[in-house]
Amino acid sequence: MIVLGIESSCDDCCAAIVEDGVKILSNIKLSQKEHKKYYGVVPEIASRLHTEFIMSVCQKAITNAQIHASEIDLIAVTSKPGLIGSLIVGINFAKGLSIALKKPLICIDHILGHLYAPLMTIKIEYPFLSLILSGGHTILAKQNDFDDIEILGRTLDDACGEAFDKVAKHYKMGFPGGPNIEKLAKCGNQYAFNFPITIFDKKENRYDFSYSGLKTACIHQLEKFKDKNENITNNNIAASFQRVAFENLIIPIKRAIKDTNIKKLIISGGVASNLYLREKIKNLEVETYYPPIDLCTDNGAMIAGIGYLMYLKYGASPIETDANSRIENYKYTKGAKL
């Protein structure tokens, strides 16, 4: 089955052609550079640019896959969660294409896409632990099947990648913050600043994460530099922030490994490409897997891949399905299933 996957939940305009859920025939992504000067994604600009480029991105995906549009068997599109304007552009385009080509439509949860992405290139048996690290999500889950996912922990405030972006913005390190902080940290002292590590000891929160305290402490350090008329040491700030940001992850992961006795961990999302994080994870007594870099960040291939499996099991989505910027809160509580 040939599936066109469309992903437009944030600022990346993505489309891919995937055969039978795993064979990637094309994977096109157009990143919007217009947001860099704002040090963050501007929703209105993102949706306008999606409107401008989504057709050409899909056309390129079809051309690169060396197929004709009529050969598409299924259209999969991200419908939630994300920026509502961006989601609407993607889902409305997918609906129009579905009607024009007379092909079924399947609406996909963006998080399910990230959880499935590593399985397109990695052979691993269920169950296993999954960690999603991105600008919008920080989620630790136990996967029993592609559609049977138990949320163990999640961020209670800022996502990991979001904290990177906000710190980078205040220190004018550039956008996106993740790769810029990682680069600066290589020349810094990671123990120059003792930023707080937030760990929850209550049973119901033992796998949860928090980044608001770390982010605030890091930003307040900038004010201390100014008050004392000291030089701002971006390299040391980046190194210290990065160290603590990932130490915040390690303890909940260790707890999950011990409590579930599962020794397999998949890490996906844009932050998963950070090499410092990968070195820290090596110290855990667990088999660790990462998708290729192009599948770590937002992409259409993961939407097409999981769309194929969801369609085979559940059938097509109603054409009336709307975009939804958020998932219901219960989806993120301990023990909930996506």
Swiss-Prot record:
InterPro entries referenced in this protein's UniProt entry, alphabetically: ATPase_NBD, Gcp-like_dom, KAE1/TsaD, Peptidase_M22_CS, TsaD
Source species of the chain: Borrelia hermsii (strain HS1 / DAH)
Gene Ontology terms: cellular component: cytoplasm
Organism phylogeny: Bacteria, Pseudomonadati, Spirochaetota, Spirochaetia, Spirochaetales
Known function: Required for the formation of a threonylcarbamoyl group on adenosine at position 37 (t(6)A37) in tRNAs that read codons beginning with adenine. Is involved in the transfer of the threonylcarbamoyl moiety of threonylcarbamoyl-AMP (TC-AMP) to the N6 group of A37, together with TsaE and TsaB. TsaD likely plays a direct catalytic role in this reaction.
Residues the record lists as binding Fe cation: 110, 114, 298
Binding site for substrate: 132-136, 165, 178, 274
Catalytic activity: L-threonylcarbamoyladenylate + adenosine(37) in tRNA = N(6)-L-threonylcarbamoyladenosine(37) in tRNA + AMP + H(+)
Name listed for the protein in its UniProt record: tRNA N6-adenosine threonylcarbamoyltransferase
GO molecular-function term, one example from the UniProt record: iron ion binding
Pfam families linked: TsaD
UniProt entry keywords in alphabetical sequence: Acyltransferase, Cytoplasm, Iron, Metal-binding, Transferase, tRNA processing
Signal peptide (from-to): none
Cofactor binding note of this UniProt entry: Binds 1 Fe(2+) ion per subunit.
Subcellular location: Cytoplasm
Assigned EC number: 2.3.1.234
EC main group: transferase
Biological-process GO terms, alphabetical: tRNA threonylcarbamoyladenosine modification
